[in-house]
Amino acid sequence: MQADIQPNYGDMNATCSCGNVVKTRSTLAKDIHIDVCSECHPFYTGKQKTADTGGRIDRFNKRFGAIKSK
């Protein structure tokens, strides 16, 4: 096997836009900036908004559900 072909695996920081710093290890040599993390993402914070996404059948029933066939 060849010697020293593995990349360097060192410590790095991932800084979120909310100010949270995540310390991790990576082959990437520099610190990175991320947009969202588990501290500020709506799914993890519980502030997620649910949109009422009615489908095509709901729309059809709303338009034509009151009409009765003879």
Swiss-Prot record:
This is Large ribosomal subunit protein bL31. Binds the 23S rRNA. The gene is rpmE. The keyword Lipid biosynthesis does not apply. Zn(2+) binds at residues 16, 18, 37, 40. Belongs to the bacterial ribosomal protein bL31 family. Type A subfamily. Its cofactor is Zn(2+). Pfam families: Ribosomal_L31 (PF01197). Binds 1 zinc ion per subunit. Part of the 50S ribosomal subunit. It comes from Saccharophagus degradans (strain 2-40 / ATCC 43961 / DSM 17024).
